[in-house]
Amino acid sequence: MPTSMLWAVDLFGRVYTLSTAGQYWELCKDVQLEFKRVSAATQCCWGIACDNQVYLYVCSSDVPIRHREEAYENQRWNPMGGFCEKLLPSDRWSWSDVSGLQHRPLDGVALPSPYWEWESDWYVDENFGGEPTEKGGWTYAMDFPATYTRDKKWNSCVRRRKWIRYRRYKSRDTWAKIPSKDDPKELPDPFNDLSVGGWEITEEPVGRLSVWAVSLQGKVWYRENVSHPNPEGSSWSLVDTPGEVVQISCGPHDLIWATLWEGQALVREGICRNNPKGNSWSIVEPPGSENGIMHVSAGVSVVWAITKDRKVWFRRGVNSHNPCGTSWIEMVGEMTMVNVGLNDQVWGISCEDRAVYFRQGVTPSELSGKTWKAIVVGRESDRSHSGSSSSLLSAGCFFGEEVRGSGTESAPSDTDASSEVERQGPERSLPKESLDNSRNLKGSSSKGHESTRNTEDPMENACLAEGQAKAPKTSGPDECHGPAPTPAELPWTNIDLKEPKKASNQPAAGFPETSGLSSLGLFPMGMEEPYGADDHPLWAWVSGGGCAVEAGSALKWFTVQSGLSPSVQTLSLSITPAQTAAWRKQIFQQLTERTKRELESFRHYEQAVEQSVWVKTGALQWWCDWKPHKWVDVRVALEQFTGHDGARDSILFIYYVVHEEKKYLHVFLNEVTVLVPVLNEAKHSFALYTPERTRQRWPVRLAATTEQDMNDWLTLLSLSCCESRKVHGRPSLQAIWSVTCKGDIFVSEPSPDLEAHEHLLPCDQMFWRQMGGHLRIIEANSRGVVWGIGYDHTAWVYTGGYGGGCFQGLASSTSNIYTQSDVKSVYIYENQRWNPVTGYTSRGLPTDRYMWSDVTGLQECTKAGTKPPSLQWTWVSDWYVDFSVLGGTDQEGWQYASDFPASYHGYKTMKDFVRRRCWARKCKLVTSGPWLEVAPIALSDVSIIPESADANGRGHNIALWAVSDKGDVLCRLGVSELNPAGSSWLHVGTDQPFASVSIGACYQVWAVARDGSAFYRGSVSPSQPAGDCWYHIPSPPKQKLTQVSVGQTSVYALDENGNLWYRAGITPSYPQGSSWEHVSNNVRKVSVGPLDQVWVIANKVQGSHGLSRGTVCRRMGVQPREPKGQGWDYGIGGGWDHISVRANATRAPRNMSRDQEAHGPGPVCC
């Protein structure tokens, strides 16, 4: 789970953040402002300061926020002077936008606010539809509203060119004031409340936010055009309400609730993709007539509320179809406010002790949770206090008395112990008023939502005889600490508290004064702390809109050891998990060596049993190879025997019945090349391949009744195959990695003769074993760095382990295995045909496709009948319309065409008689494997530099390039064998979004844009990892490229039609090459290795018995003088979707024949 932030404001207006992986509240970097309340999203936070102005805090990121400004220069031809700026009176402006309706001179385009800066000056865009234009960037047409082309024709009477300029948002990690322009709609009064949400509105474009605000006059305002490229938005618009609003809350989806002065709640209805502001309000009555609602918080499927008597309420039956819900349920506890974050997790601030509480037990099946638990972590400034007290460990009375004192008490609860540890210490710096209040509160108790108890500090008991003042410690939400007034004395809007005075810094009685103790009363930069060193902060507001906490996740906010002082706690925390893991590994290594020494003395004894046999039997289903092709019940037996030399081998027997005659089929597991799970909605099945069955494209398919049974058999058979081939442990540095269309990861160890020119090993004899995890793309390097990308664009890095998933605990490493999740979408299509009576309906012709089908129209797929890809996946969303399909859509998501097998477009014409609409639904898989997440940027492609075995690059960092899901090109810094995840991203500017990137062995970087154009990055080197500029490379004629792969000297590219192209003419003096040469068709993915070897995933391969889709293929005959090769060698398939051979730098033995010697030396880096 990636780290995220919980935001909070204390009573003094200071903004703090708490990481889900942290144990301290960190003060916001910009401390000049004091805030009343904040509302957070994933990448930003909005707030209302004490000056009643709205501010925006955008978190820093390696990827900048860039916005492209465009202007078009228009010219018309005349017989006197040719093309000039003199236009006809009916023409558009000489400088305009793309439509020509708006005047847009270059000097008239200004920055929207002081928080933006220009990246460069205006320059001409010489890219037109993926093809480079002539010098000057002009495109020509017969008239302005016509279609433009790159080439000038005899009837080209007008021309235009596009000027572009990028601006960058520079206000990161600081509060930026939202500008208020002088216009008639300027705010009449200051803001009182603000809420951010709506980033997951169904069908909403990624990055859009909904910002709602309430003024002191009770009016509701909406911020227009807030999105990731435009974080400030454009303007405020007034939203009519039936009454005066006090407070408003916007959930991540389409829930918006507000509270009225009269105590009722307002619910906004009609929110959708095309209308994020909604269209009407509905009134919801409060739980009781005596106490109205004063605070609400909306989530994804929940709404929580606080009434005027501080009671907490949960709204039942809330969802997108019924935003008003059904009824109120009273919850335990009294809060001043609550906030619902991501995944419907809830935080609140207690009205008694002003502490932040987290609602535990919130799950999709139990949205109300189970209990409140206090967050007991301290502030980051408290680290020096707890750390300096560690020097007192040498004082015997301190450590001994504390242990004796703690032993006389009963074990406290987690919350009590955490609060007690947080407030203990060898020196008290509480103000005198606070100590007096503590004495007055001694022995008192109040009614609350959780059981509380009073405990005394054992440290103070030990030092009471020395004259140290004893202050009883209180904990729990029902006790008040420090100068906090009672709830009745707290104003709702204006909080004006005086800072408590500091107590004099004197050393504790009985302890020598040390530098560590004296530092407890000092604060950095002369800044006074509003709390004592042992006080917990008093909170006024909390926001979890950007805090992602999954149900059941272990947080460090509550796990503080009970009965230990801060000094002992600091000591225990100083032992890092890495040190603990190293200590365990050392013990394991010593035990292993001892076992070897003890067994060495008995090796000369003869074995008592020369040969052993082990058999496992079970019942499975087998897909019959002959008619009628169907699943039949069979008995299977795995017989494993150990030979005289200790080698193990296994045979799998499949017993079946044909026409009442018993027969069997046997497979030697040392001949099995791969065991692969099969994507099946209704069966837990897997396939077994041998070299012969790989050539036939007809594997042995088996199915189990349960997923656990299938995993058991799959694990056992895979382990037996690995033992037969003596393959164990983590993959080698030269391993070949691949991914199936199901997301399963497979790895193969290359033999020395795999890339030999003579007597090479056929691909169908390669042995593949499965690794735990789930990925869509994988990329490897010969120095052991392996990265992968999931279906949800999450980046993962290989940890060095092996196994995981179904192999956990049996054929898996004990360390470096972590939980991994992935999310993908399932798509179905709604088809309709037009008729003159009723228009478009779901009644088609008898020859038409199904009205609910897949993308091909050949298979019927309804909403109710469509299931997740396999039983391992679970639905995590409802069906929604997908507006991002190729060709565009109208406002309702429809695409139109003349007939179903034709091309679709997003607008209706007179000849369009059919239409379709794409529906999507997300599903999630949770597994485990040797992978760690690389946060926080989502990626769509990644490339690691391939290095040959004799390359002298061990001293340099490993070059890694990637493309984000938004199309940004990134370069990863700090990647090495010891740190495969790297340290940070370096953004590489582009003029358009990219789709693919690849770096070669000599730091030659090639990339493909989303419009199909190719680019080469110049001057990339270890000292200049990002290079200097992009060179536009013309694509193959009438083709749009989708992927590129670069080896040592070879560059291969793939177009959208499955054609494979080779870039010819690449030399050290001209690394861009001269032309594209066609190599093959029927290709889905390509991977070029450090030896310029070429491997692909073929779309279709015909075998002797069947057809396979997605087959691993190797290009044969690739040599320095024949870089394109001469044919294909077909390997494992089908169902494979990605392969990476960029780690395989294993050269063939040097028994070169005369023919090989005639080819001359190897390739030279460009």
Curated annotation (Swiss-Prot):
Belongs to the TECPR1 family. This is Tectonin beta-propeller repeat-containing protein 1. Residues 407-418, 437-446 have a biased composition (Polar residues). SUPFAM superfamilies: PH domain-like (SSF50729). It comes from Rattus norvegicus (Rat). It holds the Pfam family Hyd_WA. The modification Phosphoserine is found at S386, S388, S391, S413, S418, S943. One of its GO terms (molecular function) is phosphatidylinositol-3-phosphate binding. Interacts with ATG5; the interaction is direct. Interacts with WIPI2. Interacts with the ATG5-ATG12 conjugate, the interaction is however mutually exclusive with ATG16, since it does not interact with ATG12-ATG5-ATG16 complex. Residues 616-722 form the PH domain. TECPR repeats lie at residues 209-240, 254-285, 301-332, 344-376, 734-761, 958-989, 1003-1034, 1049-1080, 1092-1132. Residues 403-492, 1147-1166 are annotated as: Disordered. GO terms for biological process: autophagosome maturation; autophagy; macroautophagy; regulation of autophagosome maturation. Keywords: Autophagy, Cytoplasmic vesicle, Lipid-binding, Lysosome, Membrane, Phosphoprotein, Repeat. InterPro entries: Beta-propeller_rpt_TECPR (IPR006624), Peroxin/Ferlin (IPR006614), PH-like_dom_sf (IPR011993), TECPR1-like_DysF (IPR010482), Tectonin_beta-propeller (IPR051513). Tethering factor involved in autophagy. Involved in autophagosome maturation by promoting the autophagosome fusion with lysosomes: acts by associating with both the ATG5-ATG12 conjugate and phosphatidylinositol-3-phosphate (PtdIns(3)P) present at the surface of autophagosomes. Also involved in selective autophagy against bacterial pathogens, by being required for phagophore/preautophagosomal structure biogenesis and maturation. The PH domain mediates the binding to phosphatidylinositol-3-phosphate (PtdIns(3)P). It is found in: Cytoplasmic vesicle, Autophagosome membrane; Lysosome membrane.
